[in-house]
């Protein structure tokens, strides 16, 4: 008999008070939750398609990245000029200016990395939702027994309340 408990049960004092649940209880509750999801199938799929369109459109992020790259090039050129001037005129103020330009350049690079990561995250989420849509769309009838492949394809994670209630967080953001 497999029993599941809170991932953080013993992490803090007092210990987590959520009850243990058996794998069989989770399986039965998933079948019920998935069948409720099927009752909303058309609306859920329509909502998922809208979400995918929104996620897929990274044009504003791409414009922001392009603007940051231009600014980065401008700052790099200013740093280069400051370095050349520093060679011909040894002044402490020029060295500080170089450092400011380099710090600004590094800051812009970090912003670009963050925005590119956000674009990738959105594309990955879009792909997951597409898989979720395909899985839900091909499910014609309610399920009577637990299907592990189906479970893995649609569930992101599960929460168990202190009262023993179960929340299935689906990949598309729906919570049942």
Question: Each predicted region: which residue ranges?
Answer:
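Amphipathic alpha-helical coiled-coil/heptad-repeat segments
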Residues: 1-176
């Amino acid at each position: 008999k497999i029993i599941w408990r809170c991932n953080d049960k013993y992490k803090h004092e007092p210990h987590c008070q959520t009850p243990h649940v058996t794998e069989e209880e989770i399986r039965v509750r998933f079948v019920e939750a998935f069948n409720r999801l099927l009752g909303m199938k058309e609306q859920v799929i329509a909502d998922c398609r809208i979400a995918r369109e929104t996620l897929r459109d990274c044009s504003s992020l791409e414009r922001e990245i392009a603007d940051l790259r231009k600014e980065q090039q401008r700052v790099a050129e200013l740093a280069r000029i400051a370095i050349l001037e520093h060679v011909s005129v040894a002044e402490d103020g020029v060295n500080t200016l170089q450092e400011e330009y380099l710090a600004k350049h590094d800051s812009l690079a970090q912003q670009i990395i963050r925005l590119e990561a956000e674009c990738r995250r959105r594309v990955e989420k879009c792909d997951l939702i597409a898989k979720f849509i395909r899985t839900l769309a091909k499910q014609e009838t309610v399920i009577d027994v637990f299907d592990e492949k189906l479970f893995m394809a649609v569930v992101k994670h599960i929460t168990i309340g202190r009262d023993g209630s179960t929340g299935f967080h689906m990949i598309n953001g729906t919570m049942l």
